[in-house]
Amino acid sequence: MSSLKRVAIVVGEASGDILGAGLMAALKKRYPDCEFEGIGGPKMLALGFNSLYQMDRLAVMGFVEPLKRLPELLGIRKSLRQRYLTNPPDVFIGIDAPDFNLNLEVNLREAGVPVVHYVSPSVWAWRRGRLKKIAKAVDLMLTLFPFESSFFNEQNIPNLFVGHPLADTIPLENEKTGARERLGLSAENNERWVALLPGSRGGEVEHLCERFLLAAQQSFAGRPNLRIIIPAANDARHSQISEVLKRYSELPVTLLHGQSHDAMLAADAILIASGTATLEAMLLKRPMVIAYHMAAFSYWLLSKLVKSKFVGLPNLLADKELVPELLQHNATPSQLSAALNVYLDSEKTTQQLIEQFNAIHLQLRRDASETAAQGIVDMLAAKRDIAR
C-alpha cells in the first residue's frame, strides 16, 4: 500500500474530536485524496469527515448510563464491525473510548485490518486485565505521556509517545494581565487571585465546593487582598455553586460561566479537583493543590483498584509529588488552606515549581498530530514490508 485511500476513525467525546481533527489534518498533508469515515465530532466534520453516527451517542459516563444504553451501543459497534470486515479500511484508528473501541479493534485486527489506538487506557493505574485485550487489539498504541510509553514497553506492546496537543498549543510563557482584563477582574496590583475548580460533575462539586470555599475562607482571614474566582463548568454547576455561595457572602468571589482557561490563567494559585484540568493548569505554569473527595465506599473500592502512586497528572509526569495531593480524609479545609498558603506566601517555592512545570511542558511538546501521523505511516510501511 503506497498511499492511504480510506481511513476509519472512531471517537467518543469532544477531546477525541480535537485529537481526530489534528490527526486528519496531518494525514491529509501526506495523502490529500484520502477519505475519512467512522464516528467523529464537529471539528472532524469540518475537515470533510463522514460520520456514520453522531459522536454524542457514544458519550456515556458513570456505571448506570452505559448499562441503559448498552443495546444501542452494541448495535452501533456491530454495524461498524460488519462494515469494516466487509469493506476493510487501510487502517482503523480508535481514539480513546476504550470500552467501545477495544473489542471492535480486536475483531478488525484478527481479520487483517491494521489497527491504531490513540490515547492509552489508564491500565497503568487500574484494570490491568485489559492488557491482554490491548495486545490483541493494536498494531500501534499512540500515547500522550512518556510514562505510558515506558509502561507499554515493559509489556512488549508496540507504542509511540507523541506528546500532548495541549502542550503544543499552550505557550511556554503565560501572563495573567490579559486574562484578568478579559474576565473583568480588578487590576489592582496588590490583589492575589485564587481559582477554585471543584470539578465538572454534580457529585464532584457536592463533595469539593464547600471544602474549597472553607479553605479559601481560612486563607482570606489572614490575607484581605485575596480574591476568589470560580469557573462553573456548565449551567447546572453554576446553579449548584451559586446555592453554596449564599453561605459565603463575606468572601470576595467571582463566579463565571465556563472560561476555566482564563480563570486558571488569571490566578496566582489554584485549588483543583483531580482530573485532566490539572494538566492544563500545569501547562499554564500555575501552582496548584490537587484534591478529591467522594463517598466513603466509592473511595474504599477505588483505593483497592488503583495501582498508581499518584492521581494528579503533574505528579505522574514528574514521578514524584510535585504538587500536594489531598485526597478523601486529607482533603480538609485546614490542610487545603495550609497547602495553598505556601504558594501565596513563598515566591521562591512558586518559582521552583514553575521551572519544573516548564521542563515537563517541553517534554510533552512534540507536535503531537504530526508525530502521530508519521507513526501511523511508518507502522503501515513496516507491515507492508513484512508482507512482501
From Swiss-Prot:
Cited Pfam families: LpxB
Gene Ontology BP annotations: lipid A biosynthetic process
Protein family: Belongs to the LpxB family.
Name of the molecule in the record: Lipid-A-disaccharide synthase
Taxonomic source organism: Saccharophagus degradans (strain 2-40 / ATCC 43961 / DSM 17024)
Record has Nucleus as a keyword: no
Keyword Lyase listed: no
Record-level Gene Ontology MF annotations: lipid-A-disaccharide synthase activity; phospholipid binding
Keywords in alphabetical order: Glycosyltransferase, Lipid A biosynthesis, Lipid biosynthesis, Lipid metabolism, Transferase
GO cellular component terms attached to this protein's record: membrane
Enzyme Commission numbers on file: 2.4.1.182
Swiss-Prot/TrEMBL catalytic activity: a lipid X + a UDP-2-N,3-O-bis[(3R)-3-hydroxyacyl]-alpha-D-glucosamine = a lipid A disaccharide + UDP + H(+)
